[in-house]
């Protein structure tokens, strides 16, 4: 029988999109089956952290120009955040290991908001560096505590998927949040970008308060017990792979804006698209890991 041209055209368009739909299908299925309000709150938290960490990459030239420092000096603001990450996780273990998990998450999300709000108001380079350090303090601790919470609220046999859903917020930040922050910095000011990250931190704080259930603290095994797992080789191998992988990414990504502008010849107006393409690569990598996350590793 004769098919109307319009119907054939619609089916052809749908067929063209089928590889993309198949690519996202496992992720969509996991979100539909396992998405809970508490996981949404955690994903909003990692989204705020992703913007807080990576937004510097797109606005680095604007900050250097505004504060009257060189690009390498402005790059130290990225290092200050990383230093805060290194100090924040063990500091949380020392100070809050006996506190309820929800209280810890509330304190960490509040610190995201406060750190970025103060960064938006920083009067000079050194104050901004201090606030970048403060903004980095909750990063590692939030992922650690958030992973425990995600595992506790997950359905039986779906703990890994629950943690992956929480981390989706970070990849969404790279895909949409960081390019948006770059665009806002170009149009308005880098201070406005940090203020928006602070607002997102407040949103995450509100959702954690409303949707994350109260949970008892982890059993207190003492300070030595917290690091007993480091006696075996496997954690050191994981730490080494993460360190090398992230080190390689940051060596390139930290200075993507000046490299694209001064070396490759792109304009500042192109930065938003470039940052978005980099974010899409991270997003695609997370999707691929989610697709294969339940498969045996050996």
Task: Briefly describe each language-model feature range.
Residues 44-71, 253-257:
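Extracytoplasmic
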Residues 68, 100, 121-126, 265:
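Helix-breaking motifs and short loop linkers at transmembrane-helix boundaries and internal kinks
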Residues 87-123:
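Conserved MFS/SLC helix-loop-helix module at the cytosolic interface between two early adjacent transmembrane helices
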Residues 115, 126-134:
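Paired small-residue
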Residues 131-168:
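Cytoplasmic helix-loop-helix junction between adjacent transmembrane helices
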Residues 156, 165-209:
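Helix-loop-helix hairpin linking two adjacent transmembrane segments in secondary transporters
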Residues 212-238:
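Juxtamembrane intracellular "pre-TM" segments in multi-pass secondary transporters
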Residues 288-297:
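Residue-level detector of conserved catalytic or cofactor/ligand-binding positions
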């Amino acid at each position: 029988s004769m098919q109307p041209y319009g119907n054939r055209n619609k089916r052809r368009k749908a067929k063209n999109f089928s590889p993309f739909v198949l690519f996202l299908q496992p992720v969509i299925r996991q979100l539909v089956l396992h998405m809970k309000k508490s996981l949404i709150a955690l994903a909003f938290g990692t989204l705020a952290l992703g913007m807080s960490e990576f937004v510097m990459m797109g606005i680095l030239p604007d900050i250097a120009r505004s504060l009257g420092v060189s690009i390498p000096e402005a790059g130290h603001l990225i290092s200050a955040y990383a230093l805060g990450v290194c100090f924040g996780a063990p500091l949380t273990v020392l100070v809050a290991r006996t506190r309820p998990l929800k209280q810890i998450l509330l304190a960490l999300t509040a610190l995201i908001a406060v750190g970025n709000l103060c960064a938006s108001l920083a009067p000079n380079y050194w104050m901004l560096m201090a606030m970048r350090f403060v903004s980095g303090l909750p990063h590692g601790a939030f992922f650690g505590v958030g992973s425990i919470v995600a595992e506790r609220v997950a359905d039986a046999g779906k703990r890994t998927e629950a943690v992956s859903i929480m981390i989706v917020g970070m990849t969404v930040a790279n895909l949409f949040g960081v390019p948006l922050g770059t665009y806002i910095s170009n149009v308005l000011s880098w201070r406005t970008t940090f203020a928006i990250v602070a607002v997102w931190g407040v949103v995450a704080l509100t959702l954690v308060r409303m949707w994350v259930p109260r949970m008892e603290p982890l059993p207190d095994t003492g300070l030595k017990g917290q690091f007993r797992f480091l006696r075996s080789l496997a954690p050191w191998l994981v730490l080494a792979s993460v360190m090398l992988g992230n080190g390689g990414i940051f060596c390139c990504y930290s200075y993507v804006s000046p490299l694209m502008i001064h070396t490759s010849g792109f304009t500042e107006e192109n930065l938003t698209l470039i940052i978005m393409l980099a974010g899409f690569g991270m997003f695609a990598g997370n999707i691929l890991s989610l697709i294969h996350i339940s498969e045996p590793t050996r």
